[in-house]
Amino acid sequence: MQLYNKLSAEERARIIDENSQERITLSFYKYFNLGNPTLFRDHLFIVWSNIDVLGRIYVAHEGINAQLSVPKENIDKFKKSISEITPLNEIRLNIALEHYSKSFLKLTIKIRDKIVADGLNENTFDVTKIGEHLDAQRFNQMLDDKNTICIDMRNHYESEIGFFKGAIKPDVDTFRESLEVIDRELEKNGKEKNYLMYCTGGIRCEKASAYLKHKGIKNVFQLEGGIIEYTRQVNENNLKNNFLGKNFVFDERRGERISDDIVSNCHQCGNPCDSHINCINESCHLLFIQCKDCREKMNSCCSNECMEIIKLSYDEQKSLRKGKHNSNKIFKKGRSPKLKFKIN
């Protein structure tokens, strides 16, 4: 039985284009006790491969975290495959606000120690004792309460392009660093405040709220379904939208437009912009914000150095990449030497 991708991303993209295939981008997560992650992973790969599901899925003893792209014509088959797994049979699917047929180009299901890399030792507190989930309307009400401390549980590059009004946006690279920010807020504001948290789809707030409960905080709240579900409820129920800008997403779209506000700037020229791009130089692949003008001037590169590298032959570029590991390279303003140049 084939348990890995037979097609490259480029081949898959071509097939999607040729078939004019309409696909739905969605995500879900679930914390539950999984005895055999390997068996579960292989089962999912077989079932989902047969209905052309693509995406990035993490499986661990603690559950599943999935971001997927499903052919519209197969969405009922996909839902049936989920319903046949007891812990997942009533799970909410976070449907993307904007659909892009090539949001994912491979089906990747990986076994991990955890479904979110949180750096926590769960033996020190009960992860099932979490905060109260709020829908969009109640979240808005809590956000307006002067006794509320709202914390964005995402990383700096996510909150840079979009956030809730009045939220604390930690300048962090990891979830574990966000918890250190929570500790500082507790020390500064005390335990009697309302602590309100949000993230993309809700998964990071689950453990963060359990962490706060462990710290002895009574008034702990989290946004049900994250920014994705919040926006759906706002649109369907004609509620006030308190989110400014884009919601960063971890697929080829890089973001969903929530409001018309542009709250960030091009990392090269400083003009208003909220479009992330990976440097086209494969030996770099830096994630940063680049406007249309700079993209044209810089040939989708992050630096003059990378512009020179992409002029080399394929073999020369491949030789430069040998032995280098470039995953998770993300620009952080003031910390990256790559972007210390000025476009005239």
Model features per residue range: what roles?
Residues 2-132, 155-195, 203-344:
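Rhodanese-like catalytic fold shared by cysteine-dependent sulfurtransferases
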Residues 131-145:
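Internal catalytic-core helix/loop-beta-alpha segment
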Residues 144-147, 191-192:
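Short, well-ordered loop/turn elements at secondary-structure boundaries
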Residues 149-153:
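Short hydrophobic beta-strand that contains or immediately precedes a catalytic carboxylate
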